[in-house]
Design a protein with these regions (language model features):
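Conserved catalytic or regulatory cores that recognize and/or transform ribose-phosphate-containing ligands
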Residues: 1-119
């Protein structure tokens, strides 16, 4: 059984873009789960919680999530990146990819592996 950490760019000045990314993560995570694989989507988990962290700035929110993400990344055996616009520029996505590569684990783009999870 595959154990997948799902990554996607998240932050953006336009709240509509952020919401789109959240919904896209949910859709992709559902597809992966239906295939029988384990999936952890950090954006799917954190987005609703972030709505209750209005007193924190972006940097503080990132610091809050970093150790939580690390626990989930340690449990997963590959990362799949939703390669939406902004994924290459996302420091969070790049950090997550690097963590998996440093562990010798696969790092794939959704556009290249989506066919492995059915229609």
């Amino acid at each position: 059984m595959r154990k997948i950490f799902l990554a996607c760019p998240y932050s953006h000045a336009d709240r509509v873009v952020v919401e789109h990314r959240f919904q896209l993560c949910n859709s992709v995570a559902a597809k992966i789960a239906r295939s029988g694989s384990v999936v952890f989507s950090q954006v799917s988990m954190s987005h609703p919680i972030n709505a209750h962290l209005g007193d924190l700035d972006k940097a503080s929110i990132g610091k809050l999530w970093a150790p939580i993400d690390a626990v989930f990344m340690d449990a997963m055996t590959e990362i799949i990146v939703i390669d939406e616009p902004g994924w290459k520029e996302s420091s969070g996505v790049q950090r997550e990819i690097e963590i998996f590569k440093n562990r010798g684990l696969p790092a794939n783009l959704w556009s290249e592996v989506s066919h492995e999870f059915g229609d």
